[in-house]
């Protein structure tokens, strides 16, 4: 992160607002497409029961995103303050700490989900007739959930001085997810595991791009 990538001190408020707003909005749109894409491909390629299993397992997705929002928003505020004071090294440490701690925390949650998928599915209220589908998706998704959290955290830090970079990283991640969803579900017939793996790979690519930028 660099302090002068966007001149907050001299740029007009309207221009600054637009410079931050539109890339951020587009990035959020592409982020939402992650979920929408999975729903469309799962529903059309696997069936309604599989789509129901994915939707019932959604609280895990929300938890991972919430973890990312908590660490990302808080950490980015602290980093922004340090950048304003000219402490770029401290701001980079803030980004590293927020990303690593959230990644580790979500990894621990994922391990629990993968160790007890049936119990988690029952807690989430999954009907017995689709519990195997829910187990399949929970195990596959949990293996990559920490990258969703990390991607969310990194997006906040990248937006501090590179809102367009954050937007393009999310765009690339979403496109990869769409392409892999089609390949894994319709071509290779990997089912719900394929849908989760496609999403995970897209998120990993997004994380790599943002880490390279930061």
Regions found by a protein language model. Name each.
Residues 1-24, 79-144, 187-214:
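Short alpha-helical transmembrane segments in multi-pass integral membrane proteins
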Residues 14-33, 37, 60-67, 104, ...:
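Residue-level signal for short hydrophobic patches within transmembrane helices
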Residues 33-36, 45-48, 82-85, 159-161, ...:
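Helix-loop interface residues and adjacent transmembrane-helix termini in multi-pass membrane transporters
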Residues 38, 75, 116-117, 150-154, ...:
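Hydrophobic/aromatic residues in alpha-helical transmembrane segments
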Residues 42-62, 129-136, 192-193:
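Interfacial/gating helices of multi-pass transporter permease domains
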Residues 51-111, 148-166:
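Small-residue-rich hydrophobic transmembrane alpha-helices
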Residues 63, 177-182, 207-211:
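Hydrophobic transmembrane alpha-helices of multi-pass small-molecule transporters
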Residues 89, 102, 157-182, 193, ...:
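Alpha-helical transmembrane segments of multi-pass membrane transporters/permeases
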